[in-house]
Amino acid sequence: MSITEYATELKGALRQYPNFPQEGILFEDFLPIFRDPQLFKKLIESFKLHLQEKFTGKKIDYVIGLEARGFLFGPALALALDAGFVPVRKQGKLAGEVVHAVYAKEYGEDVFEIQADSIPEHSNVVIVDDIIATGGSAKAAGDLALQLNANILEFCFVMELDFLKGTQKLQAPSFTLLSGQEEALSK
């Protein structure tokens, strides 16, 4: 199957919730994909095919997953790519020496951390999360990878809120598997 065929099938599994978590957002719940092992495999295979096609001849050393939903598929994707998995967590959740990045949220700031020895310098990394909205958390993960002198090949997302233009903040190109939400819901 092609990535497009996989994406069509995966999109059919999403559940939609208008005006959640706030007015104007159509929340698309991708958790039903994980209830069906065949759909979960297709999700991983879609990202694997995309990355292998785009980065032919280049080894992806690590998949970096953002807390918490990047943890749902990041480790499986890392295994499929024969790469390591490295988590980015909220402040205070990782042991040992960490580096941190601050990012803006709707009502203040938050901090992401990564273990300082988790990625050797010049490693090729891909950063994954379920969705990109404003881009703050993804950019913070990119900042962490760059602090460790990693080479960010790409950011990969299952979904995107295009109208928030979050990908414009990122330090590398991005790929969104399922079509995004191009505009806010009308009120």
UniProtKB/Swiss-Prot annotation:
Keyword set includes Nucleus: yes
Instruction: Report the domain of life of the source organism.
Output: Eukaryota
Is Nucleus given among the entry's keywords?
yes
> Gene Ontology terms, cellular component aspect?
cytoplasm; nucleus
Which intervals of the chain form a coiled coil? none
Q: Which UniProt keywords apply?
A: Cytoplasm, Glycosyltransferase, Magnesium, Metal-binding, Nucleus, Purine salvage, Transferase
Pathway recorded for this protein: Purine metabolism; AMP biosynthesis via salvage pathway; AMP from adenine: step 1/1
Localization of this protein:
Cytoplasm; Nucleus
Where AMP binds, per the record, is at 133-137
* Chief location: cytoplasm
Please give the catalytic activity noted in the UniProt record.
Answer: AMP + diphosphate = 5-phospho-alpha-D-ribose 1-diphosphate + adenine
Single GO biological process annotation from the record? AMP salvage
Which GO molecular function terms does the record list? Answer: adenine binding; adenine phosphoribosyltransferase activity; AMP binding; metal ion binding
What cofactor(s) does the depicted protein rely on?
A: Mg(2+)
Q: What's its job? A: Catalyzes a salvage reaction resulting in the formation of AMP, that is energically less costly than de novo synthesis.
Q: Which NCBIfam families match?
A: apt (TIGR01090), PRK02304.1-5 (NF002636)
Assembly and binders = Homodimer.
Q: Known HAMAP family for this protein?
A: Aden_phosphoribosyltr
Recorded family membership: Belongs to the purine/pyrimidine phosphoribosyltransferase family.
Please report the name of this protein according to its UniProt entry.
Adenine phosphoribosyltransferase
Gene name? APT1
